[in-house]
Structures are given as structure tokens and as C-alpha cells.
């Protein structure tokens, strides 16, 4: 199967939120996932929303996620990826910092940091 000009072994991947800080993506490839997405990554480190931030709706059999993009920031994440080359198709989910004054610039900062 080919996606974005890259061959992947299968269409089953791991979405952003599982490996928020790009710590285990190569292990996920070894488990057999066809692609992995890390993040969400913001320009600078942030801790996310205060707890509680995950809520269970038993009647609806659902969860509400209000984690708030807790992550180590683009500098550390970029360093990790550069020093631990992905063994598969790696996506990077980017987002703005919670208290930013310019959300568009936050996206551009991350895009410039990771696009290579």
C-alpha cells in the first residue's frame, strides 16, 4: 500500500495522543503498525489543562478528552526524531499553545520545525 509516495505494510496506524512526546514510535512500528502519528506538539512545552481532564459518560459509553495538548514542545520533540530516525511513516500532529496570541504563527513555527 502506498500513501504520500511511501510504501506502508498495512493501513492500520496509531493516531496522535498515544505517543505525545515521540518516545515510542519505533517500538510501535515493530509491533506492526503501518504508520504512527506523534503529538499533538506545540511550539513550546505546556502542561495541558488542570485535572480532572478526562471524563467518562457511562450512559453514552463515551469519554470526553480535555487534556489540552500536554507535551514537551517542538524543540525537544524535533531533537528526538532527528536522533531516532523513524522506521516507518511518521506523522506529526501540531497545534497552538493554549495561551498564544497568534495561533496561526504557532502552526507555522511547528511546520517549519518539522518539515524537512
Residue ranges and their predicted role:
Residues 17-19, 41, 95-99:
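Active-site beta-loop-alpha junctions enriched in small/polar residues
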Residues 29-30, 80-87, 112-116:
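Acidic (Asp/Glu)-rich catalytic clusters
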Amino acid at each position: 500500500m502506498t500513501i504520500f509516495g511511501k510504501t506502508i505494510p498495512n493501513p492500520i496506524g496509531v493516531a496522535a495522543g498515544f505517543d505525545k512526546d515521540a518516545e515510542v514510535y519505533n517500538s510501535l512500528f515493530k509491533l506492526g503498525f503501518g504508520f504512527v502519528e506523534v503529538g499533538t506538539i506545540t511550539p513550546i512545552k505546556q502542561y495541558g489543562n488542570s485535572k480532572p481532564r478526562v471524563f467518562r459518560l457511562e450512559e453514552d459509553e463515551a469519554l470526553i478528552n480535555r487534556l489540552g495538548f500536554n507535551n514537551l514542545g517542538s524543540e525537544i520533540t524535533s531533537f528526538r526524531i532527528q536522533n531516532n530516525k523513524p522506521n516507518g511513516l511518521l506523522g506529526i500532529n501540531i497545534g497552538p499553545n493554549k495561551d498564544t496570541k497568534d495561533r496561526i504563527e504557532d502552526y507555522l513555527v511547528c511546520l517549519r520545525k518539522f518539515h524537512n
